[in-house]
Every structure is written in structure tokens, then in C-alpha cells.
Regions:
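Acidic/His- and Gly-rich active-site-bordering loop/insert found
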Residues: 3-141
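Acidic/histidine-rich catalytic neighborhood of metal-dependent amide-processing enzymes
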Residues: 133-219
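Short charge-dense sequence patches
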Residues: 1-4, 16-18, 108-116, 180-182, ...
Length: 219
């Protein structure tokens, strides 16, 4: 029997690889919000996928914010006592390096050597410059092919949220209170919360999933 963790990890990776291929670079000098129309392509896709998972109120508002609610699956009296938890990520990517036509590469079973990126022989991720690579020997590592950025900031967070929602929907034995989902545009240009309606979002506590090592957290 396949382990549930393996299934969840497989779903997470599949989502991440799809999302990074969607161009969502934000722009510093734009007078629109979101700053680039391409961000709405991923926003609409995420809202549709959330609806398909049963989150009926999933929507993209006029500013490009994706929000949705995963209702509690606790008895009503218990659900009323627990806090509403928010999960937040941003869908735009950094404008300083091209994020169009991203070709992700999965390096299976990393062996500990420098990582050569196949799209550009001059692009090598060297262990001497990135000693943290040694913490991931034996794991799969995902990079771009070297011709673009990857977009893990923050499509890794987006994929984590979507995979977590899917897991909770498909595993009702995992009990939880109300969960609010918020995915924002334009974080990379400093405007991720510019039109974010905190009161409407309605979370008692919210956690941004954006960067960091496994298990790392900040207040």
C-alpha cells in the first residue's frame, strides 16, 4: 500500500511543477493592480481548483486576490470555540529575472555534487557557495533549467496550501476548524497587502508560507 505521505508529496510536486510554468512576474513601474495581467491566469486557475475541491466560496476579486474557505469538520459546538486559521501565499514572482517559459528540472536522488543546469552550461549551483545542499543528499531537488528563475518564491507556498486543502478535503478523519485561504498578487513589488481586506478575510491567526527551510518558522 502506498503511504499517505508519499501520495501527498506526489500531489504537492505535481502542483508545483504546473504552477511554476505559468508566467506571473510582477512589475515595479506598473500603475495597475495587479501590476501585470498574467498574474490573473494563475489566480483564476487556483480559484477554479479550489471550487473543484468543494470550497464553494472560492473567488478572485477585482484586485486579483484569491480567497476561499474550508469549513470546519468538527461538531458545531466545538467548531464555534476554535480559532479561524488563515493560510497565505503570493503568486507573483520576482521581476529582476525572467519568469516566462520556465522549464523546471527535477534532480532525482541528489548525490551531493554541484548541480549543473541543463539550459545554460554556465549556470551551476555550487556546493561551496550553497553548503545547505548537503542537508538534502538523497532527496529530489527542483531547479529551473538555468534560463529563467524557478518561481519557488512563492509558488512552493501556493502548492503547499493547495495540497494541504486537498488532503483535508480527502481525509475527513483529519479534524480541523475553519481554514481561510488567501493568495495575493504583487508581493514582490511591495504591494501584496495593499488592497487585502483583513476584516473580510476573517482569520484569527494567519500563517504566510513563503520561503525558509523545512520546519523553519518566524513570528
Amino acid at each position: 500500500m502506498t503511504d499517505t505521505f508519499d501520495l501527498t508529496q506526489s500531489t504537492l510536486v505535481e502542483r508545483f511543477l504546473r504552477y511554476v510554468r505559468i508566467h506571473t512576474t510582477s512589475a515595479e513601474d506598473s500603475e495597475t493592480f495587479p501590476s501585470t495581467a498574467c498574474q490573473l491566469d494563475l489566480a483564476r486557475l487556483l480559484a477554479e481548483e479550489l471550487k473543484q475541491l468543494g470550497l464553494a466560496d472560492a473567488e478572485v476579486d477585482g484586485y486579483g486576490y484569491v480567497t476561499a474557505t474550508l469549513p470546519a469538520n468538527l461538531p458545531p459546538e466545538e467548531a464555534a470555540r476554535v480559532p479561524v486559521i488563515g493560510l497565505i501565499a503570493h503568486l507573483d514572482t520576482y521581476h529582476g529575472v525572467t519568469g516566462e517559459n520556465v522549464n523546471p528540472v527535477v534532480h532525482r536522488g541528489y548525490g551531493g555534487a554541484d548541480l549543473a543546469l541543463p539550459g545554460d552550461p554556465e549556470q551551476v549551483i555550487r556546493v561551496v557557495d550553497n553548503p545547505e545542499l548537503q542537508d538534502f543528499i538523497g532527496d529530489d531537488i527542483i531547479t529551473s533549467d538555468g534560463t529563467t528563475l524557478l518561481g519557488a518564491d512563492d509558488k512552493a507556498g501556493v502548492a503547499e496550501i493547495m495540497a494541504a486543502v486537498e488532503y483535508m478535503v480527502r481525509h475527513p478523519e483529519f479534524k480541523h476548524g475553519p481554514v481561510r485561504i488567501g493568495i495575493t498578487p504583487d508581493e514582490e513589488v511591495g504591494n501584496g497587502t495593499k488592497f487585502f481586506d483583513v476584516a473580510k478575510f476573517g482569520a484569527d491567526y494567519a500563517y504566510p508560507l513563503d520561503g525558509g527551510s523545512p520546519g523553519e518558522g518566524e513570528n
